[in-house]
């Protein structure tokens, strides 16, 4: 390649870049998988919670790519294996976890509503999952991965960034609060974290400014 004057991009052959690519792929497939399962009769409790208790429309559920992880232990794991991914790749994506007796792997999220964590490029970097049966913790997050770092991620900013730049940021407590506010037409919302202020500035880009409104 060098003799032919062709410069190869090293990042395409970098092991870390290739691992990140696999994680993005697995997350994308997982997002679609859980979205589809939300339409299944076994997801009736999740459907009832979202539509009746939280009053979310089909459009909102679809826009935020909300899904459902069933009670089964390894449905997603087996699905991803059939898609051609190996156990280590799936584990590094954070969507499976080791069994307590260390004798294998199970899906990380079970009987939970799934909220994909979307970055500013529109890619899923991780997941937050809400318990439907009282299992603790109430909200379970993806572990830290090569593409997900919880202290630098802002949920919903992919949709609210433009409005925050012009209207200021309105803080809310969690995913459901943000989604409900967004559906109601309040589109400059972001989830409140202690570290949030400087992270918003970084995410919006250098030179951006905005007012902060606390709710």
Please provide the spans of the model-predicted regions.
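Membrane-proximal amphipathic helices and linker segments at transmembrane-helix boundaries
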Residues: 41, 53-61, 67-77
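Phosphate-handling DNA/RNA-contact segment within nucleic-acid enzymes
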Residues: 15-22, 26-29, 72-188
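Short alpha-helical
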Residues: 71, 176, 195-199
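Conserved active-site segments centered on acidic
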Residues: 1-45
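Short, surface-exposed acidic
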Residues: 5-13, 54-66, 85-92
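Conserved N-terminal catalytic core of the sugar/cofactor nucleotidyltransferase
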Residues: 187-215
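Structured alpha-helical
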Residues: 50
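Flexible loop residues that form catalytic
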Residues: 69, 130, 194
